[in-house]
Amino acid sequence: LSGTVLDALESALKDEQETVDFYLDIADYVKDRAIRDAFKRAAADEQNHAVWFLYFLSKR
């Protein structure tokens, strides 16, 4: 993989991980169960994206 692609993947991975943390922080803060569950599902989805980016990075 070229340096540009690697840089993009690393940036995307970092962004996904930060988003997971952000969504989980919101889920911990809100009292409404439906909203909390929605943010937890969104965090899990973002974590799945991070796993894919990590997979692509491991293929260098």
Regions from the language model: what does each represent?
Residues 1-60:
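Non-heme di-metal
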